[in-house]
Amino acid sequence: MIQMQSKLDVADNTGARSVMCIKVLGGSKRRYASIGDIIKVTVKDAAPRGRVKKGDVYNAVVVRTAKGVRRPDGSLVKFDNNAAVLLNNKLEPIGTRIFGPVTRELRSERFMKIVSLAPEVL
């Protein structure tokens, strides 16, 4: 469950290390985002020669949450951290590599590129 002011790690090679959620997209009263949801983030920590710099605002998709996601068979998939992948205005990933596992819930028409770049799909 990601809400405004939540800090997330970045799971791609854009150069951003951590981001902060500034808005959960999808309705004016929407409070929480989970895996597969799009959020608006600002870069809080960035590598010196990365593609993004501190203070930039981007869209991002949540790929891992500590809260986890419940599957129809009753199993629960949790992670140690909250992580996101930065997106451009066309909702395509900015980075060319994804670090760490992602969940099968991202296998929609929108995020197949992220699933194909990920080293492991749970």
Swiss-Prot record:
Record GO biological process: translation
Xref: CDD domains: Ribosomal_uL14
Gene Ontology MF annotations: large ribosomal subunit rRNA binding; structural constituent of ribosome
InterPro entries: Ribosomal_uL14 (IPR000218), Ribosomal_uL14_bac-type (IPR005745), Ribosomal_uL14_CS (IPR019972), Ribosomal_uL14_sf (IPR036853)
Pfam families named among the record's database cross-references: Ribosomal_L14
GO cellular component: cytosolic large ribosomal subunit
UniProt entry keywords in alphabetical sequence: Ribonucleoprotein, Ribosomal protein, RNA-binding, rRNA-binding
Entries under SUPFAM superfamilies matching the protein: Ribosomal protein L14
Subunit description: Part of the 50S ribosomal subunit. Forms a cluster with proteins L3 and L19. In the 70S ribosome, L14 and L19 interact and together make contacts with the 16S rRNA in bridges B5 and B8.
Similarity section: Belongs to the universal ribosomal protein uL14 family.
Biological role: Binds to 23S rRNA. Forms part of two intersubunit bridges in the 70S ribosome.
Family matches, as NCBIfam families: rplN_bact (TIGR01067)
This protein's name: Large ribosomal subunit protein uL14
Gene name per UniProt: rplN
